[in-house]
Amino acid sequence: MKRLGQEAIDVYFVHGWDRHTPIVDTLATLTDLVKAGKIHNIAWSNVSGWQLQKIVSTAQAEGFVVPVAMQPQYKLLERGIEAEVLPCCLENNISLTPWSPLGGGWLTGKYSAANRPRGATRLGEDPNRGVEAYDIRNTDRTYRILDVVEAIATRHTRPMTHVALAWL
């Protein structure tokens, strides 16, 4: 932190659910860090709706700090959080900060059925890499969504990235 010229972290994200550590222990530690001025707010990434609600309920019941943000995978191509995570965030006034909102390049117009990833790029070197893998997303559903995004972008003379981010 000293090297960065910072005294505290604005928002500390816990990257997932730790099934080996009781949530009360994690929240107690994070609350201690907030009280010590090391971090200002806490948040979570990649947890389900029930896990997020357990975090919030435990924090409230025990007098610990409550998360201010949730960072799920969310974009036009992946809307799985809408059934549980999104309602939990709304109910508990938790901000949403999606990761990979452009789908690893998919929602930029970078990839298409005719334009496979090539060369020294993440997917060019390994088309099966990660959740945005070309071979996983290379589906009719993906191309139908991309066609609509592209049509909206063209109609408004904006890049596809603007449409995808505005949708959020």
Where are the model-predicted features located?
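Beta/alpha (TIM)-barrel catalytic core signal, keyed to glycine-rich beta->alpha loops juxtaposed to Asp/Glu
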Residues: 21-168
